[in-house]
Amino acid sequence: MLPARNRMTRSTEFDATVKHGTRMAQPDIVVHLRRGSEPDDESAGPRVGLVVGKAVGTAVQRHRVARRLRHVARPLLGELQPSDRLVIRALPGSRTVSSARLAQELQRCLRRMPAGSGR
């Protein structure tokens, strides 16, 4: 589970991260990262948001995918800068893959992001 201070909850945060952040795709997830987006909000630490649409499956399947994504995102909080905003969008294939593969894809995305990610 992600701590409350590290969760994105406002749609404006999601919109800004998706619109102005850098996108990296993998077979089962798409990651949007916006670095240094809100300098006055750094004390809260990095924030992570999930997008798991109906294309992923039934409500039970979507919630399962969301739980697994939260679980794999939590250890990566230490690698992010305090002002970073991260949105993870689950693709339909994420419903059938293992948590280990989701973690591997997320780590691969974050490693390949340019240092100054964000527009």
UniProtKB/Swiss-Prot annotation:
The keyword tRNA processing applies. GO terms for biological process: tRNA 5'-leader removal. It catalyses: Endonucleolytic cleavage of RNA, removing 5'-extranucleotides from tRNA precursor. Keywords: Endonuclease, Hydrolase, Nuclease, RNA-binding, tRNA processing. It is an enzyme of class 3 (hydrolase). Pfam families: Ribonuclease_P. Its EC number is 3.1.26.5. The keyword RNA-binding applies. Transmembrane segments: none annotated. One of its GO terms (cellular component) is ribonuclease P complex. It comes from the Bacteria. One of its GO terms (molecular function) is ribonuclease P activity. NCBIfam families: rnpA. RNaseP catalyzes the removal of the 5'-leader sequence from pre-tRNA to produce the mature 5'-terminus. It can also cleave other RNA substrates such as 4.5S RNA. The protein component plays an auxiliary but essential role in vivo by binding to the 5'-leader sequence and broadening the substrate specificity of the ribozyme. HAMAP family: RNase_P. Consists of a catalytic RNA component (M1 or rnpB) and a protein subunit. Belongs to the RnpA family. This is Ribonuclease P protein component.
